[in-house]
């Protein structure tokens, strides 16, 4: 029997699990401090989404308003537990964030991507920002963007 994955909004009670997952995924210098994560839960509750099974945090995506354009979201983190990578959880979280973006009337989602993940984000509908000629295309160092066409 397969255990269903739930996508839920992060809450303060999830903070310890989020920190544990982050610590197992990033070196110390790339981890967000606890107070920043807590502030993100408070300020970005709609766009801080968790993937959970019955009793374990499997991954999360954290997005927030892009400071230079409040109608655009920026993905700050996409983290999947190493034992659950390559099982579609990242794609599930990206799809959930896109749904939230449509619901909240954001016009686009931006992200920075390391070279080894470019094709993954392209598969999920993100395009090279340099290929766009829109007000969202700017030389802010973002390499991928998804447009809300709804």
Could you tell me what each predicted segment is?
Residues 80, 86-99:
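Conserved acetyl-CoA-binding loop-helix of GNAT-fold acetyltransferases
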Residues 112, 127-145:
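Conserved catalytic-core motifs of GNAT/GCN5-like acyltransferases
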Residues 4-18:
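A short beta-loop-alpha structural element at the N-terminal edge
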Residues 12-13, 20-76, 81, 94:
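Acetyl-CoA-dependent GNAT
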Residues 101-113:
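Conserved GNAT acetyl-CoA-binding A-motif
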Residues 121-122, 126:
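Conserved active-site tyrosine of GNAT-family acetyltransferases
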Residues 93, 117-120:
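Conserved short alpha-helix immediately C-terminal to the canonical SAM/SAH-binding motif I
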């Amino acid at each position: 029997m397969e255990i269903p994955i739930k996508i839920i909004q992060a809450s303060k009670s999830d903070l310890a699990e989020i920190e544990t997952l982050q610590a197992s995924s990033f070196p110390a210098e790339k981890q967000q401090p606890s107070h920043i994560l807590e502030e993100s839960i408070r300020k970005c509750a709609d766009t801080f989404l968790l993937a959970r099974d019955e009793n374990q945090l499997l991954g999360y995506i954290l997005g927030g308003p892009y400071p230079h354009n409040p109608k655009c979201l920026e993905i700050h983190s996409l983290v999947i537990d190493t034992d659950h990578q390559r099982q579609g959880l990242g794609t599930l979280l990206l799809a959930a964030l896109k749904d939230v973006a449509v619901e909240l009337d954001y016009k686009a989602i931006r992200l920075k991507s390391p070279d080894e993940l470019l094709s993954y984000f392209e598969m999920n509908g993100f395009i090279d920002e340099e290929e766009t000629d829109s007000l969202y295309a700017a030389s802010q160092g973002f390499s991928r963007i998804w447009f809300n066409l709804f």
